[in-house]
């Protein structure tokens, strides 16, 4: 594993904040400002465990968690306050601004619209999507008119939206929309209700993208991996595939490498969310795989050869899987050694109490990453993204950001 022998990285936090960056694995409902969460809760009469930031940090959004279940506990509050169009627009706007303020030029914001929908109150798929897009676009337009872009030569800010289907939800307590789905399909098996909702999501995503020109750039499947394998959603991803909607899959976060294999072979994944278990053959549970280490090696080689990017979320993985222990044990080191296309991401800025710059700092303080490799990681964020423009525009934008990386590296004496 490529672990740094130095206790401190040569890259300062100032440099990391100034260099161009992208965050391609960023959950809206996990990335609210804590003071805004309190404001939204009061406005919408949502009960919180505390109405102070320190109180929320002590009780809900902790520095460390016992397990994935405790980590996910906070989403009941963030989703509750986001079932409001004003709050959705505010959250999206503030998320973009927070990224801009730390030098992030491109984000792909993902969330599950059906978790936030409440049709009885007029909060439909379309209104949810427009509220989020309005907030992101407002922040984009303001930044791209600023002196930072117009006079200082910084790259402009752009964004895309990734819609998440849910691997699992129950007949009550998840969202008004999901409760209504179970009522409508009361004679169906739960997994069939879940798959129906996922198909409704992808069809609506393609429709709104094509008819209303919203930058819905990708599909994701999120939620509990164990018991809800990717192959059950093959038809959903087939529809996305046939309609040029790009595809990422939460895979290998809490289940073995066979989950990653299914994401690639059953869901046509263009990118992988987390992918942590790729180099943990002990997490493989498929008894038909006799040589687990060999299986992991071959799968890793396939992913590297195909340049399928992995969205790496270090802090989140450490929090949801305490068994990792120290960051030096994280499989990011193996990803580097095996030359995988990796992208440093936050996952959830509030729940993990992190930023893109913080994630880079953690990675570079722990693993030996020379400047050329660092530039490669930055480049993957712009070359492997689901940019809402055409390929020529995407290439030009990536070129602009990487030229700016060289300028910043020169300023800090690395070139």
Label every model-predicted segment.
Residues 249:
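A glycine- and charged-residue-rich anion-binding loop/surface
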Residues 2-245, 253-271, 276-415:
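Metal-cofactor-binding active-site regions of metalloenzymes
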């Amino acid at each position: 594993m490529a672990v740094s022998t130095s206790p401190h990285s040569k890259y300062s936090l100032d440099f990391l904040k100034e260099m161009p960056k992208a965050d391609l694995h960023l959950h809206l409902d996990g990335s609210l400002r804590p003071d805004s969460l309190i404001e939204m809760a009061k406005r919408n009469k949502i009960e919180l465990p505390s109405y102070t930031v320190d109180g929320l940090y002590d009780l809900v959004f902790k520095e460390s968690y016992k397990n994935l279940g405790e980590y996910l506990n906070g989403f009941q509050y963030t989703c509750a306050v986001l079932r409001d169009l004003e709050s959705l627009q505010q959250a999206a706007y503030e998320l973009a601004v927070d990224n801009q303020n730390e030098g992030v030029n491109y984000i792909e914001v993902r969330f599950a619209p059906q978790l936030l929908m409440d049709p009885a109150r007029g909060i439909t798929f379309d209104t949810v999507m427009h509220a989020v897009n309005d907030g992101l676009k407002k922040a984009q337009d303001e930044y791209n008119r600023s002196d930072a872009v117009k006079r200082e030569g910084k790259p402009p800010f752009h964004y895309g939206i990734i819609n998440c289907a849910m691997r699992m939800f129950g007949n009550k307590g998840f969202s008004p929309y999901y409760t209504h789905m179970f009522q409508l399909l009361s004679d169906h098996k739960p997994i069939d209700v879940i798959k129906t909702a996922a198909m409704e999501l992808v069809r609506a995503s393609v429709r709104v993208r094509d008819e209303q020109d919203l930058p819905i750039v990708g599909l994701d499947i999120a939620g509990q991996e164990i018991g809800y394998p990717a192959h059950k959603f093959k038809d959903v991803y087939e529809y996305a595939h046939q309609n040029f909607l790009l595809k990422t899959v939460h895979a290998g976060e809490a289940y073995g490498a066979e989950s990653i294999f299914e994401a690639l072979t059953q869901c046509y994944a263009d990118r992988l969310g987390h992918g942590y278990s790729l180099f943990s053959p002990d997490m493989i549970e498929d008894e038909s795989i006799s040589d687990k280490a060999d299986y992991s090696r071959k799968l890793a080689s396939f992913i590297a050869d195909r340049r399928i990017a992995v969205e790496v979320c270090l802090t989140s993985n450490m929090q949801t899987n305490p068994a990792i222990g120290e960051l030096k044990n994280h499989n990011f080191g193996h990803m580097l050694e095996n030359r995988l296309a990796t992208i440093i991401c936050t996952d959830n800025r509030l729940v993990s109490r992190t930023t893109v710059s913080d994630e880079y700092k953690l990675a570079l303080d722990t693993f030996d990453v020379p400047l050329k490799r660092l530039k490669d990681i930055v480049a993957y964020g712009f070359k492997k993204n689901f940019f809402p423009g055409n390929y020529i525009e995407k290439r030009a934008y990536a070129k602009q950001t990487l030229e700016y990386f060289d300028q910043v590296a020169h300023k800090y004496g690395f070139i």
